[in-house]
Amino acid sequence: MEILLQKVYDQKNLSKAEMNIVATEIFEGRLSKTKIAAFLMALKVKGETAEEMAGIAEAMQQVAIQVDFPAGTAMDNCGTGGDKSNSFNISTTSAFVLAAAGIPVAKHGNRSISSRSGSADVCQELGIDINMRPEDMTYLLEKVGIAFLFAPHVHPNMKYVMDVRKELGTPTIFNLIGPLTNPVHLETQLMGIYRRDLIRQTAEVLGQLGRKRAVVLNGAGFMDEASLAGENHYALYESGEVHLYTLKPEEVGLASYPLEAIRGGDAKENAAILRSVLDGEPGAYLDTVLLNAGFGLFANGKVKTVKEGVDLARDLVRSGLAKQKLQDLITYQKEVLAK
């Protein structure tokens, strides 16, 4: 172990297997807080590689609470957060649109990172229980086609690094890998990231983690979501290859809006925004969800282009199917809790 730690201190890269060894030591509580802090900072200064990101993500999945679901059928659209945009809950709202398209969505999420309301906060405001048992999450995925997986609940071993991360007060590899650690074995994924320079690398990581198809994007204004404010940069992973692209909202039939147009509020305000979007209320909030759901449908392979995805997303909202998914989740969850 000391040899591997020293390797990083010497600014040398770890292999995926080596990182898995170090991460397992961390998640099993065998490394001191001092050593964890030194390791994370050395890694940050050196720069995290795709192999290192994949290694630590796999280690987290290995010690996570497992949620059983047929391998290779579900997707997630969780982002890293950390873009300081203070936007409303875009990926959470988009998840109901994806589920309405018949895609099982294992929505991995947490409390607020860069806004006043994280996905967990808004879910609670909507009446969604974020601390359900693994078997209940499986039931909801099978019955409704969407379930919320609260990150601290499914990753209890993160307690060994929580204090260290707070003490360091700076982004580390853990700020990048949250969306990579969904305990459900995903087939496809849409992942927003706040660092544009890591788009390609993160797409490669998703390939190493077994995704068949994935999109990693960084929006205009360096958002970890697709944005209507300008050019969006994204990477498509498929068949072992990564290709880079850009896309502006006008290319998919959407108007441009400044970032200020999608500002969010607290959990109560964001829950109201989410409901207004699923009701089809026109404006920047709805169009932002259509764009992100369009990317999600494209990442899943449900459509051949983002434009087709946006058009399908619009139909799913107009038909009321996306709104019905939210109601179904609340209804069936009550049924589970009543047992």
From Swiss-Prot:
Gene Ontology biological process terms from the UniProt entry: L-tryptophan biosynthetic process
Pathway annotation: Amino-acid biosynthesis; L-tryptophan biosynthesis; L-tryptophan from chorismate: step 2/5
Residues noted as binding anthranilate 2 in the record, renumbered to the chain: 165
GO cellular component labels: cytosol
Free-text remark on how the cofactor is bound: Binds 2 magnesium ions per monomer.
Residue positions binding 5-phospho-alpha-D-ribose 1-diphosphate: 79, 82-83, 87, 89-92, 107-115, 119
Sample GO molecular function, one term: anthranilate phosphoribosyltransferase activity
The UniProt record lists the keyword Magnesium: yes
Top enzyme category: transferase
One Pfam family per UniProt: Glycos_transf_3
Alphabetically ordered keywords of this record: Amino-acid biosynthesis, Aromatic amino acid biosynthesis, Glycosyltransferase, Magnesium, Metal-binding, Transferase, Tryptophan biosynthesis
Names of the cofactor(s): Mg(2+)
The EC number(s) this enzyme carries: 2.4.2.18
Superkingdom, natural source: Bacteria
Binding residues for anthranilate 1: 79, 110
Catalytic activity: N-(5-phospho-beta-D-ribosyl)anthranilate + diphosphate = 5-phospho-alpha-D-ribose 1-diphosphate + anthranilate
Binding locations of Mg(2+) 2: 224-225
Annotated residues for binding of Mg(2+) 1: 91, 225
Subunit annotation: Homodimer.
Record-stated family: Belongs to the anthranilate phosphoribosyltransferase family.
Purpose: Catalyzes the transfer of the phosphoribosyl group of 5-phosphorylribose-1-pyrophosphate (PRPP) to anthranilate to yield N-(5'-phosphoribosyl)-anthranilate (PRA).
HAMAP family on file: TrpD (MF_00211)
Protein name in the entry: Anthranilate phosphoribosyltransferase
Native source organism of the sequence: Listeria innocua serovar 6a (strain ATCC BAA-680 / CLIP 11262)
